[in-house]
């Protein structure tokens, strides 16, 4: 057996109470069943309400408890000694969502196997490794103490004890430095008493890693700086990756055949061998076959989108693709400003249409249920697409598609067809990214910032195959420290001002200015992720793409 995937669903132990039903209380008769099924009905339930937060914590604990118990009871041989666990298993904590596993493991060892606290803790902290997948503070889970005390009182007791012992260790290591002790405490006192799950994971793990070289450095220098100073040997980097079996061999069989015909078999299991293709970069036959593969993949995605969504893509366009979850730091808004600028320049006559490469921009994204600004951005992209695609003045030069319900199945069709991969997050905010890897693996060029795994991709593919733009992470920090005023960039760049004014005028929303006020207001008066600051550099990079 190579690996085991466990899929859990919650079921009530008593799903139907006939006595209560017969008394006429029909809802109460199935309450236990409904409550249990809700736990696993929707992965990551929306948590902007107290009820949503409670359900999400219940779900996290349910998955964690089921997985730990399954491993200990069914995977380990009968009669094994739990003291051997560190020699047999490492539980990987992927982000903060499963970190409740730490007190659950302690509960199992202390309450079910009757180990002494110190022995149980010694075992537990050798059984976990923590991967942090973010640099956004809001993405590092923090659970109210009051909620944990109500739902998982025993686990909260255990967390208190872990924190008590940890703080004692800190005071011994840093005598008199109470400010540091408060910063590092697993339990925060402000703005409300809460458990910092990233701190708990770091304290309990034998290794802590980021998911790209830059991300791991920022993790040590900023997000978990105090911890990296205390335990420098605990921190490492493991850059994210993608499986070539799915994202080239399965999704792009034509390119797979071309590569195999060129350098032989075995490269799927050893991607370093792709470097052998360098010798064929100027080979006319190889280049012609590569162009034919890309053209065939464009035909395939055109057929899929027409059948799936009624979207008819123009032929012979540069396929410019931005597919990823919708978040402000990923800056779909910056891509939208580029589209509006191209549109404005075409309809105003500022540029000769013949001088522009025909371009189709494809978006794919979903927003978290409670993420208002992300939903506003999706709305605006679709409105811009509707106007652009029906304006005869830009026909044959610019087209925008936003197929709904982007998923892995659709990704396997879009990615092989892409000419240009948009990886334009604000420098210092993208932990790694994996879409950037999938596009590069399928022969797309990248336009992107010096962020996440972009840094390592650019080192491998070379500057000629990567259109770099934007501020570096230190430059971002410097601008924010000086005080960022997006209005200054708006007033100082005529193209940017025209693009924003065109959106704000209601041009894309049938004259309804209120429909775009949230997005425009945020760009002009907040712009947390500096889209306006990077706009000029981004347009210059897009002009290099055209060249």
Spell out what each predicted region is:
Residues 1-547:
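A conserved ligand/cofactor-binding region detector
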């Amino acid at each position: 057996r190579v690996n085991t995937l466990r899929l859990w669903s919650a079921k009530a132990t008593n799903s139907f109470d006939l006595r209560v039903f017969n008394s006429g209380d029909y809802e109460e008769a199935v309450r236990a069943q409904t409550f249990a099924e809700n736990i696993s009905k929707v992965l990551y339930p929306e948590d902007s309400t107290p009820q949503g937060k409670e359900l999400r914590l219940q779900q996290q604990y349910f998955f964690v408890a089921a997985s730990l118990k399954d491993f200990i009871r069914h995977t380990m041989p009968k009669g094994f000694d739990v003291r051997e666990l560190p020699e047999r298993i490492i539980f990987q904590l992927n982000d903060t969502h499963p970190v409740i596993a730490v007190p659950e493991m302690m509960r199992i060892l202390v309450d079910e196997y009757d180990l002494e606290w110190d022995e149980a803790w010694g075992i537990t902290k050798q059984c976990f490794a923590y991967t942090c997948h973010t640099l956004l503070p809001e993405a590092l889970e923090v659970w109210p103490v009051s909620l944990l005390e109500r739902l998982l009182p025993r686990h909260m007791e255990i967390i208190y004890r872990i924190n008590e012992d940890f703080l004692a260790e800190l005071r011994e290591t840093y005598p008199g430095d109470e400010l540091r002790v408060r910063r590092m405490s697993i339990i925060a006192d402000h703005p409300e008493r809460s458990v910092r799950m990233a701190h708990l994971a770091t304290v309990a793990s034998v290794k802590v890693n980021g998911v790209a070289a830059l991300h791991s450095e920022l993790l040590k220098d900023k997000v978990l700086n105090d911890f990296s100073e205390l335990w420098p040997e605990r921190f490492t980097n493991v850059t994210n990756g993608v499986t070539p079996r799915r994202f080239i061999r399965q999704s792009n069989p034509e390119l797979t055949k071309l590569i195999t015909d060129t350098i032989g078999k075995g490269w799927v299991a050893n991607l370093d061998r792709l470097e052998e293709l360098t010798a064929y970069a100027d080979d006319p036959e190889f280049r012609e076959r590569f162009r034919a593969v890309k053209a065939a993949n464009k035909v395939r995605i055109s057929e899929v989108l027409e059948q799936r969504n009624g979207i008819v893509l123009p032929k012979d366009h540069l396929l410019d693709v931005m597919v990823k979850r919708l978040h402000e730091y990923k800056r779909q808004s910056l891509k939208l400003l580029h589209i509006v600028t191209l549109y404005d320049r075409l309809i105003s006559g500022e540029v000769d249409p013949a001088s522009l490469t025909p371009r189709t921009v494809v978006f794919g994204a979903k927003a978290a249920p409670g993420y208002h600004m992300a939903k506003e951005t999706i709305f605006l992209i679709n409105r811009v697409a509707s106007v652009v695609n029906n304006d005869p003045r830009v026909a044959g030069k610019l087209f925008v598609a936003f197929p709904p319900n982007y998923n892995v199945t659709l990704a396997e069709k879009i990615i092989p067809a892409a000419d240009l991969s948009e990886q334009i997050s604000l420098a210092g905010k993208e932990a790694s990214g994996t879409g950037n890897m999938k596009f590069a693996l399928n022969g797309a060029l990248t336009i992107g910032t010096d962020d996440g795994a972009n840094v390592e991709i650019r080192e491998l593919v070379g500057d000629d195959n990567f259109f770099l733009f934007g501020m570096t992470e230190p430059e971002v920090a410097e601008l924010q420290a000086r005080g960022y005023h997006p209005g200054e960039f708006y007033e100082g760049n005529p193209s940017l001002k025209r693009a924003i004014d065109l959106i704000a005028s209601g041009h894309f929303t049938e004259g309804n200015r209120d429909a775009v006020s949230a997005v425009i207001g945020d760009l002009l008066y907040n712009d947390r992720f500096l889209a306006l600051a990077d706009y000029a550099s981004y347009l210059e990079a897009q002009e290099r793409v055209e060249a």
